[in-house]
């Protein structure tokens, strides 16, 4: 039997992978250590989340802060996590404020560590489902999982007590349980989806998206558009029993809306549903920015140029539609202008609100929309039904929200990255973590007067 000697490229890829992992972990540890010393008080909305969780840790499950808009999943998780630590360390539950209770719920950093563990330990393991299903033999996938968890929109919340990390983990897990057609667990997927609703109500849209992917994966033969739609409908009917979990989620959500009188649990006056269509373009532009290493090449630019030249009338119509949306469906929420502790404040003030920049912004929206769709097509992991379902899910999730808030784009960003090609993983790792390094420095060293 001949001796097979791995090529130098394989060795370099493996070494690069583990060097990147070590660098990333060191960066995360340093960042968390700095956060624990720097943030002596709750950060922005943390004051509501930490206070509510600490109320639960006093076994008071009846009090609810009306400023909180999301369900109590984060606080239940924090309570269970704290109780587990108490059992393991035999520590007391007494404490108060950020400084009390060394290893309990009353230490803000203990609660923050939930998201750190979730993002750095649990999420990569969940992502392995997608990696194993698609890319076993691809040397280009060595950085795949670490680049997903390095996404700056998500990375920020590893060090704060917010709902975003847990919400994202559960949606990705639910999707992973049905994504690989040889190993599908729809009822378990629906159960995990139900759990995600306890962290963010809009996850009901992503549960519907996951159900559509489950059905689409049942279609084994590639067909034309009309025939695939027909097969999709037929598979939905013949697999109705496997869809029951998702259907139950939707029914329960409708009941919740009826009983609650709306989608948010509190602060209803500041969270009214409005048509904020431009929010989709904000999201697509963010995604395009964070995935620059995947598309910045001559081939992509040439493809975009040819699309414009070969479809001039179509692109003029699209441009007019985008302009109309910018002029008529852009909402400036009072929170956006009132709080200069968010990047969104500066993006709007210095870019989006400047009239002379509108033509350039329109072009950015046009290109990012083109790039999102073409990348999903090129990725080859989703049929046109899957791509259409993704676009609909993004729209239904974002358009009703009047607030420009980049963290709302985390789930669309992560799911997008699951279904596209990543040809330059090392470059992508450097790009993403350079952004993380810059934003971390600003967070820790640039004081903001509010």
From Swiss-Prot:
Topological category with respect to the lipid bilayer: Multi-pass membrane protein
GO biological process, one term: protein N-linked glycosylation
Localization of this protein: Endoplasmic reticulum membrane
Pathway listed: Protein modification; protein glycosylation
UniProt key word Transmembrane: yes
Signal sequence range: none
Reactions listed under catalytic activity: an alpha-D-Glc-(1->3)-alpha-D-Glc-(1->3)-alpha-D-Man-(1->2)-alpha-D-Man-(1->2)-alpha-D-Man-(1->3)-[alpha-D-Man-(1->2)-alpha-D-Man-(1->3)-[alpha-D-Man-(1->2)-alpha-D-Man-(1->6)]-alpha-D-Man-(1->6)]-beta-D-Man-(1->4)-beta-D-GlcNAc-(1->4)-alpha-D-GlcNAc-diphospho-di-trans,poly-cis-dolichol + a di-trans,poly-cis-dolichyl beta-D-glucosyl phosphate = a alpha-D-Glc-(1->2)-alpha-D-Glc-(1->3)-alpha-D-Glc-(1->3)-alpha-D-Man-(1->2)-alpha-D-Man-(1->2)-alpha-D-Man-(1->3)-[alpha-D-Man-(1->2)-alpha-D-Man-(1->3)-[alpha-D-Man-(1->2)-alpha-D-Man-(1->6)]-alpha-D-Man-(1->6)]-beta-D-Man-(1->4)-beta-D-GlcNAc-(1->4)-alpha-D-GlcNAc-diphospho-di-trans,poly-cis-dolichol + a di-trans,poly-cis-dolichyl phosphate + H(+)
Molecular function as annotated in GO: dolichyl pyrophosphate Glc2Man9GlcNAc2 alpha-1,2-glucosyltransferase activity
This protein's UniProt keywords: Endoplasmic reticulum, Glycoprotein, Glycosyltransferase, Membrane, Transferase, Transmembrane, Transmembrane helix
Spans through the membrane: 12-32, 158-178, 190-210, 243-263, 273-293, 312-332, 357-377, 384-404, 429-449
EC number: 2.4.1.256
Summary of the function given for this chain in its UniProt record: Dol-P-Glc:Glc(2)Man(9)GlcNAc(2)-PP-Dol alpha-1,2-glucosyltransferase that operates in the biosynthetic pathway of dolichol-linked oligosaccharides, the glycan precursors employed in protein asparagine (N)-glycosylation. The assembly of dolichol-linked oligosaccharides begins on the cytosolic side of the endoplasmic reticulum membrane and finishes in its lumen. The sequential addition of sugars to dolichol pyrophosphate produces dolichol-linked oligosaccharides containing fourteen sugars, including two GlcNAcs, nine mannoses and three glucoses.
Protein name: Dol-P-Glc:Glc(2)Man(9)GlcNAc(2)-PP-Dol alpha-1,2-glucosyltransferase
